[in-house]
Amino acid sequence: MSLSPSSSPAPATSPPAMSLPPADSVPDTSSPPAPPLSPLPPPLSSPPPLPSPPPLSAPTASPPPLPVESPPSPPIESPPPPLLESPPPPPLESPSPPSPHVSAPSGSPPLPFLPAKPSPPPSSPPSETVPPGNTISPPPRSLPSESTPPVNTASPPPPSPPRRRSGPKPSFPPPINSSPPNPSPNTPSLPETSPPPKPPLSTTPFPSSSTPPPKKSPAAVTLPFFGPAGQLPDGTVAPPIGPVIEPKTSPAESISPGTPQPLVPKSLPVTTSYHRSSAGFLFGGVIVGALLLILLGLLFVFYRATRNRNNNSSSAHHQSKTPSKVQHHRGGNAGTNQAHVITMPPPIHAKYISSGGCDTKENNSVAKNISMPSGMFSYEELSKATGGFSEENLLGEGGFGYVHKGVLKNGTEVAVKQLKIGSYQGEREFQAEVDTISRVHHKHLVSLVGYCVNGDKRLLVYEFVPKDTLEFHLHENRGSVLEWEMRLRIAVGAAKGLAYLHEDCSPTIIHRDIKAANILLDSKFEAKVSDFGLAKFFSDTNSSFTHISTRVVGTFGYMAPEYASSGKVTDKSDVYSFGVVLLELITGRPSIFAKDSSTNQSLVDWARPLLTKAISGESFDFLVDSRLEKNYDTTQMANMAACAAACIRQSAWLRPRMSQVVRALEGEVALRKVEETGNSVTYSSSENPNDITPRYGTNKRRFDTGSSDGYTSEYGVNPSQSSSEHQQVNT
């Protein structure tokens, strides 16, 4: 049976006499070679030589137990306390008789230590002087499977090997006591009480009862035994474990085994780590919270920006969809006008007749909610709608091309204008102009439903207007006569539509071909101005036209003198043309009529002196259409005559604006004695249409003489220089 590493077999009656090692062993915790002891017990087989463990963990591990062959006397366990550093001497095999003295097993050669394993139980208090008679040997708390031979308790300690520092020593199995009379073989390792009164301070084993003092103890010890608290692996109760205290001066400083010292706090590193981890968690939580707040802020900003952008786009869309309501209010006729959105009108089976040039169409139910992307038609679709552009569907022919009536798949009647090849700009310019015109919606303007581009073919699709043109009802339909009230209504409606183009559209749209043939009538004889903006498409035409056909520079008899002479076009050019239309409504005569069998006369030249007399208070009978048979309101007739006279003034800057004409026709203002100079605008081909600059308010002679100041019209159109045309305009 092997003894525990903390006890060695020795007779219990060993005398206290022993030799002490030199005092110099205290500082370096290594015992000098001890002198031979007194007669030892029967020789035991000396343990085999084992490598010396490092000094740090040497005291913590009891010497390796060696098998005791025949102990003569009951051994007294005097193991060195664990966690004591004592450099064990190399194992020596020296047979000696049993000694009455008890030798500490710390002098026996210790087992080798493995740095990766934990050191033996550090539970023994410092082994200083302990009262004799109490021999306590704490066995190691771990139970390794390997067993080592017990230490020869009778052999004197040989000289200590050189010191080594080592890490924690792995636990070893407790020695098995071979002698049955062992008083306390499994008691916890505590300093034993032996007869010698003065134990040496050195850590080498001596016959004295005092165990070597501890020098160094590991900071933390891992106990492999996980049994009940206070119980050793073999079932015995271990005393409280306390820290190892080094003796500093004398063996008198002893610690009673009954007063255990607290363990070296193992939890200090854990506590520090816990505090560090808590601080880390707190810091991480703060960072995560800050990131969440920043993310929420960014989301809120993005939401607000998106919402504002949507609001702005919806507001712009609403304004683009309802320009006529606001702008008409500015024109003074909000009560009678309403905004129009391009839609596909329902089928209307009314007769459409075109005469005198550019034909247009009118539909009482305006096409609604048809934008340009949906207004893109294929040539095959329009050809099928018009019956292959057959003659039976031909509505008329003008300077721009042919106009055919068509019916779309949904039953909507439209007027398809097929433009002449070579009389248009490039495809890009054509589409840009069509896009501009398609956004113009007004009660008194014919809506553009769509267009078609097929190779060199260009087609425009308009809403169909059932009641023909003003020209037809004034000059061609001799079977019926337009009453005065109807004539006044047509004049007011056409003036409102033209005022919208001039003052409410951006950029300003100049019609350039205002005439009775381009004023269409719906089923209620409400006027609708058509073909506005087409002059932009055909500014580069070189086609020759007769003086009776509609052409891009306007129709003879309607063109303003400055426009015919200089090619300049302004909003006042349209005002002049509208004055000619008013004269047609008053007199019932066309813009150019035959003076005699060989001479034609301009309506303006014929009516101008008569207007002066009528406005001055004389009778209107010689001016008014005789077919009316004096069935008219004199005041209304006087207002219309005053408007016509103001519109056909020779100087453009003296002509009123169309909004003023509307108010005068409605009787809100009088233009009889008011010299309306107005402010006109002109555009150069290199200018932005939005940059409106007054041109004509400073020098009225500029248009009277036809002189040019270097500016050309927005469209770059030059009037025809044929003498016949000039003669027709100026006659």
UniProtKB/Swiss-Prot annotation:
<keyword id="KW-0808">Transferase</keyword>
<keyword id="KW-0418">Kinase</keyword>
<feature type="modified residue" description="Phosphotyrosine">
    <location>
        <position position="462"/>
    </location>
</feature>
<feature type="compositionally biased region" description="Polar residues">
    <location>
        <begin position="718"/>
        <end position="731"/>
    </location>
</feature>
<feature type="topological domain" description="Extracellular">
    <location>
        <begin position="1"/>
        <end position="280"/>
    </location>
</feature>
<keyword id="KW-1133">Transmembrane helix</keyword>
<keyword id="KW-0723">Serine/threonine-protein kinase</keyword>
<feature type="active site" description="Proton acceptor">
    <location>
        <position position="513"/>
    </location>
</feature>
<feature type="domain" description="Protein kinase">
    <location>
        <begin position="389"/>
        <end position="671"/>
    </location>
</feature>
<dbReference type="GO" id="GO:0005886">
    <property type="term" value="C:plasma membrane"/>
</dbReference>
<feature type="modified residue" description="Phosphothreonine">
    <location>
        <position position="555"/>
    </location>
</feature>
<feature type="compositionally biased region" description="Pro residues">
    <location>
        <begin position="30"/>
        <end position="100"/>
    </location>
</feature>
<dbReference type="InterPro" id="IPR001245">
    <property type="entry name" value="Ser-Thr/Tyr_kinase_cat_dom"/>
</dbReference>
<keyword id="KW-0812">Transmembrane</keyword>
<dbReference type="InterPro" id="IPR011009">
    <property type="entry name" value="Kinase-like_dom_sf"/>
</dbReference>
<feature type="region of interest" description="Disordered">
    <location>
        <begin position="310"/>
        <end position="341"/>
    </location>
</feature>
<feature type="compositionally biased region" description="Polar residues">
    <location>
        <begin position="678"/>
        <end position="691"/>
    </location>
</feature>
<dbReference type="InterPro" id="IPR047117">
    <property type="entry name" value="PERK1-13-like"/>
</dbReference>
<feature type="compositionally biased region" description="Pro residues">
    <location>
        <begin position="107"/>
        <end position="129"/>
    </location>
</feature>
<feature type="topological domain" description="Cytoplasmic">
    <location>
        <begin position="302"/>
        <end position="731"/>
    </location>
</feature>
<dbReference type="GO" id="GO:0004674">
    <property type="term" value="F:protein serine/threonine kinase activity"/>
</dbReference>
<feature type="modified residue" description="Phosphotyrosine">
    <location>
        <position position="563"/>
    </location>
</feature>
<dbReference type="GO" id="GO:0106310">
    <property type="term" value="F:protein serine kinase activity"/>
</dbReference>
<dbReference type="InterPro" id="IPR017441">
    <property type="entry name" value="Protein_kinase_ATP_BS"/>
</dbReference>
<feature type="binding site">
    <location>
        <position position="417"/>
    </location>
    <ligand>
        <name>ATP</name>
    </ligand>
</feature>
<dbReference type="Pfam" id="PF07714">
    <property type="entry name" value="PK_Tyr_Ser-Thr"/>
</dbReference>
<feature type="modified residue" description="Phosphothreonine">
    <location>
        <position position="550"/>
    </location>
</feature>
<feature type="transmembrane region" description="Helical">
    <location>
        <begin position="281"/>
        <end position="301"/>
    </location>
</feature>
<keyword id="KW-0597">Phosphoprotein</keyword>
<dbReference type="InterPro" id="IPR008271">
    <property type="entry name" value="Ser/Thr_kinase_AS"/>
</dbReference>
<dbReference type="GO" id="GO:0005524">
    <property type="term" value="F:ATP binding"/>
</dbReference>
<comment type="similarity">
    <text>Belongs to the protein kinase superfamily. Ser/Thr protein kinase family.</text>
</comment>
<feature type="compositionally biased region" description="Pro residues">
    <location>
        <begin position="170"/>
        <end position="202"/>
    </location>
</feature>
<feature type="binding site">
    <location>
        <begin position="395"/>
        <end position="403"/>
    </location>
    <ligand>
        <name>ATP</name>
    </ligand>
</feature>
<keyword id="KW-0547">Nucleotide-binding</keyword>
<feature type="region of interest" description="Disordered">
    <location>
        <begin position="1"/>
        <end position="264"/>
    </location>
</feature>
<keyword id="KW-0067">ATP-binding</keyword>
<keyword id="KW-1003">Cell membrane</keyword>
<keyword id="KW-0472">Membrane</keyword>
<dbReference type="InterPro" id="IPR000719">
    <property type="entry name" value="Prot_kinase_dom"/>
</dbReference>
<feature type="compositionally biased region" description="Low complexity">
    <location>
        <begin position="1"/>
        <end position="29"/>
    </location>
</feature>
<feature type="region of interest" description="Disordered">
    <location>
        <begin position="678"/>
        <end position="731"/>
    </location>
</feature>
